């Protein structure tokens, strides 16, 4: 009897100890999505089909392994959690390759030209509607993230320190009054950080955050596109730390899609888990035997509002951009159009991830917005007068954090108490069986 009880107790204790590790492992293991291609575009066409497929595949949250038709192996097919084939040219894949690929049809999606009679997704990248239909097929087959809602986000894009900041404030008020959450893609600043223009700029960004906005670091203006990765990281580190000093807390990064294909941008991209991808119409040739792109928690493909000529049901993981220097009347007209279409903009505060440039780590999660593990408030507007009049706002924020009940700790204790109760119940149950057996065999 004692041995049985001991086994049950050991089993439950083991579950309690191992379960968090299993959950953490499941969260961190993004899995690999293998993309096999013949050419990056169709012959005689200008559209970079491969670039579209890669960006869409990144929205699944998986790591991307890119291989051309001559470089992949059977082992690659077996190891991949999912396989996308992009065939821009007829006959590029040998029949033996086609047969091997379709043996794994449960994890295969074929896009483009195919000599077999199997199901394929047709090539039609000129039509944005078709593009998002294909995007949904990729997500339906390969996206195993917990959150698979159709999230679309409004972005006030390309906001600069020299813009009309009163206009930005007016737009933030309009969105707040209409219950529309939004993102501000704010240009990174790494020079002249003490200028009054910088103080006015960050004050306007703090106001946007207090009106339901979330800040994303925009790409810094670069005089030299050949800048080294170390120097680029250094500039973004200065920009992030400067924003934090001004009580502005960006949670992600806007990038040029060119960076996805540059080996000297790998470390740069590893400093963020949330990206908004700008489209580079002059991207050029993509031609790799092998290339690896790490997965991100949140990938938003930016489109302009003028492209919205189709059902809102197709909008998943998109950032609908309106440039920051648009007039208020034009801005309002576009918002009214989106409302008429029926777009229900998602709250960007739910984008969980981190930004780790510089000496500070910004983390956005269900616990709230945190810098180096300390909760900060982006909901309360702090004017420049308040910012420079108060000497210790950080201490005030930390004291506020102390008064916040941490529900995660409470939930953990509830879980432990529940498991303990189950263990006690099992012990009494086994003991009662023991007593009943004694009575029965008297």
What role is predicted for each listed range?
Residues 33-38, 176-292, 320, 353:
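Metal-dependent polysaccharide deacetylase catalytic core of the NodB/CE4 family, i.e.
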Residues 29-33, 76-88, 97-151:
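A glycine-centered loop/beta-turn motif at secondary-structure junctions
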Residues 31-66, 263-264:
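Short, charged N-terminal beta->alpha structural module
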Residues 53-79, 300-308:
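A short, well-structured beta->alpha microelement
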């Amino acid at each position: 009897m004692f041995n049985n009880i001991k086994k049950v107790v050991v089993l439950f204790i083991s579950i309690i100890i191992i379960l968090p590790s299993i959950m953490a492992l499941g969260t961190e293991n993004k899995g690999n999505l293998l993309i096999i291609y013949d050419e990056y575009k169709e012959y005689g066409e200008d559209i970079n089909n491969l670039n579209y497929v890669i960006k869409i595949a990144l929205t699944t949250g998986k790591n991307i392994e890119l291989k051309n038709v001559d470089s992949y192996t059977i082992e690659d097919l077996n190891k991949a959690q999912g396989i996308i084939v992009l065939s821009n040219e007829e006959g590029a894949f040998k029949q033996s390759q086609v047969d091997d690929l379709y043996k794994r049809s449960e994890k295969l999606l074929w896009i483009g030209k195919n000599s077999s009679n199997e199901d394929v997704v047709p090539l039609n990248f000129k039509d944005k509607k078709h593009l998002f239909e294909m995007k949904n097929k990729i997500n339906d087959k390969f996206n195993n993230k917990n959150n698979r809602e159709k999230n679309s986000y409004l972005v006030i894009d390309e906001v600069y320190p020299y813009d009309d900041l009163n206009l930005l404030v007016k737009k933030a008020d309009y969105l707040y009054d209409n219950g529309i959450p939004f993102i501000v893609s704010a240009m990174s600043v790494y020079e002249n950080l003490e200028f009054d223009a910088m103080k006015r700029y960050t004050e306007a960004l703090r106001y946007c955050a207090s009106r339901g906005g979330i800040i994303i670091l925009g790409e810094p203006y670069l005089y030299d596109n050949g800048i080294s990765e170390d120097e680029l990281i250094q500039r973004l580190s200065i920009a992030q730390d400067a924003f934090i000093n001004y009580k502005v807390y960006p949670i992600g990064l806007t990038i040029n899609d060119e960076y996805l294909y540059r080996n000297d941008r790998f470390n740069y991209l590893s400093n963020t888990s949330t990206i908004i991808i700008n489209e580079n119409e002059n991207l050029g040739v993509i031609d790799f035997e092998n290339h690896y792109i790490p997965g991100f928690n949140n990938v938003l493909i930016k489109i302009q509002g003028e492209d919205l000529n189709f059902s809102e049901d197709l909008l998943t993981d998109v950032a609908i951009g309106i440039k920051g220097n648009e007039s208020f009347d034009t801005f309002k007209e576009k918002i009214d159009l989106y409302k008429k279409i029926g777009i229900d903009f998602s709250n960007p505060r739910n984008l969980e991830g981190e930004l780790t440039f510089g000496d500070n780590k910004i983390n956005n999660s269900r616990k709230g917005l945190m810098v180096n593990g300390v909760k900060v408030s982006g909901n309360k507007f702090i004017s420049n007068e308040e910012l420079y009049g108060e000497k210790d706002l950080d201490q005030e924020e930390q004291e506020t954090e102390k008064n916040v009940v941490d529900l995660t700790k409470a939930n953990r204790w509830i879980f432990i108490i529940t498991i303990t109760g189950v263990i006690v119940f099992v012990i009494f149950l086994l003991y009662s069986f023991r007593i009943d057996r004694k009575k029965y065999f008297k």
